[in-house]
Amino acid sequence: MSTEQVQVGILMGSQSDLPVMTAAGEVLDELKIGYEMRIMSAHRTPAEADAFASSAAGKGMKVLICGAGLAAHLAGAVAGRTPLPVIGVPLNSALDGLDALLATVQMPPGVPVATVAIGRAGAKNAAWLAARIIGTGDPAVQQRVIDGFNAAAD
């Protein structure tokens, strides 16, 4: 967890996802956006995932980032329980992450999951997208996003 006010929840299905999903936290740290990082599974701990998703908005969170591989149901399960934007990060698995990509992107109408690239690049872009969403209502965050974008172009 970061020291800033928590605005983003970063969730992952298992401990093995941590090396990839920490990339999202690194970007949010750079942008000075507070986050909470948790491990919970749509399959193994569904009540915990449901409780987290259901209470996130009430805790002041603005965006949830979910990373999962294989069946990759975490982002969809969370999106079905929160009014917040959910960003799905498909993680690499036996089928090079294509199974997770398809599971993350194929959601029914009314339960959107914004889906980014597979793996570490996707985790970074999920954080950048979360920052852009938060920046629409926070000029200071928006300026840090602009500054980061411009620095990357140099």
Predicted regions and their residues:
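Glycine/charged-rich beta-loop-alpha catalytic/anionic-binding loops adjacent to active sites
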Residues: Q7, I33-E36, P83-L84, Q106-V116
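Short, ordered loop/turn segments at secondary-structure junctions
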Residues: Q15, M40-A42, G69-L70, L91-A94, ...
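Basic/polar N-terminal segments that are highly enriched at the extreme N-terminus
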Residues: M1-Q5
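Glycine-rich phosphate/diphosphate-binding loop of Rossmann-like nucleotide-binding domains
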Residues: V6-R44
